[in-house]
Design a protein with these regions (language model features):
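Alpha-helical transmembrane segments and their immediate interhelical loop/hinge regions
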Residues: 1-87, 91-97
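Hydrophobic alpha-helical transmembrane segments of membrane transport and translocation systems
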Residues: 94-167
Length: 167
């Protein structure tokens, strides 16, 4: 807040402060969505692997929940770990585990993420997918991580400009 005051001309200070507060709120909601997504995916994986009969299903689910925060890499690592553990039990179980993770990942990417971001952050699901694609192209994994919060801030800025919001 003090930083904004020091760089903003006085006539824009109130408007920029309001924009900053709203953008921070959306970013907080994005973090809530990420935590909820981690919990949901851990639950889905735990139940799915338990049904399949994979040993240590719930330990793997905890790992999935933790690694879920790292886009693309986290699910690949946790899915690979689960598949290897299942392969140590049987080849067929390893194959079913791999199929399960692919389906779960597709469901997450195409349904869960867009819906949670729409509900909690207020961004259009298409905008979320586009932001993540652009983020991946520009910044790799870090770009994907920052894509939705940046898109939320930009959305708030455009909303502010379109509606001429004040505090």
């Amino acid at each position: 807040d003090d930083f904004l005051s020091s760089i903003m001309p006085p006539q824009f200070e109130a408007r920029m402060h309001g924009l900053w507060v709203r953008a921070q709120y959306k970013m907080g909601r994005w973090l809530q969505a990420q935590i909820l997504l981690s919990f949901i995916m851990a639950l889905i994986v735990g139940i799915g692997l338990w049904i399949l009969g994979v040993k240590y299903a719930f330990l793997i689910a905890i790992i999935v929940g933790i690694l879920e925060i790292v886009p693309y890499v986290g699910p690949i690592v946790s899915g690979g770990l689960a598949t290897l553990l299942a392969l140590s039990q049987s080849t067929v179980l390893g194959l079913w585990t791999l199929i399960f993770f692919i389906v779960a990942q597709q469901m997450e990417s195409h349904i869960l993420i867009p819906l949670l971001i729409k509900k909690l952050v207020g961004l259009n699901p298409v905008a979320v997918i586009l932001a993540m694609l652009v983020g991946a192209k520009l910044g790799g994994i870090l770009g994907i991580l920052l894509a939705v919060p940046i898109a939320a801030g930009i959305d708030e800025l455009f909303d502010d400009l379109a509606n001429r919001k004040s505090i």
